[in-house]
Amino acid sequence: MQDIIRQIEAEQLRKDIPDFKPGDTVKVHVKVVEGNRERIQLFEGIVIKRRGGGLSETFTVRRVSYGVAVERTFLVHSPRLDKIEVVRRGRVRRAKLYYLRDLSGKAARIRDKR
């Protein structure tokens, strides 16, 4: 039974996901349905966490827009995601960057990976 479930899940995993980690700046292209039409919405920000594995793996992206911080969580293998672009690689020493929530402005910057 477990083998059947694993096999079905393996078929649904996406292969076009780039390698990204917490601290990286990413652009997430999300398919949004409004009424009867579908469009692609862009969400760019810093990955503050990545958790889970397999089909249930998620990542959270944080961005500050006009002084308001917005965090959005996405399923990595969701069909709603059109694509994920890595804009910048960041150098951090933590897996979960919750401390960024308390920082603002230049203090919230993350160093570039060399």
Curated annotation (Swiss-Prot):
Domain of life: Bacteria
Gene Ontology molecular function: any one: structural constituent of ribosome
Biological process per Gene Ontology, one example term: translation
InterPro entries given in the database record: Ribosomal_bL19, Ribosomal_bL19_CS, Ribosomal_bL19_sf, Translation_prot_SH3-like_sf
Keywords (A to Z) from UniProt: Ribonucleoprotein, Ribosomal protein
Cellular compartments per GO CC: cytosolic large ribosomal subunit
Family stated for the protein in its record: Belongs to the bacterial ribosomal protein bL19 family.
Function: This protein is located at the 30S-50S ribosomal subunit interface and may play a role in the structure and function of the aminoacyl-tRNA binding site.
Name this polypeptide is given: Large ribosomal subunit protein bL19
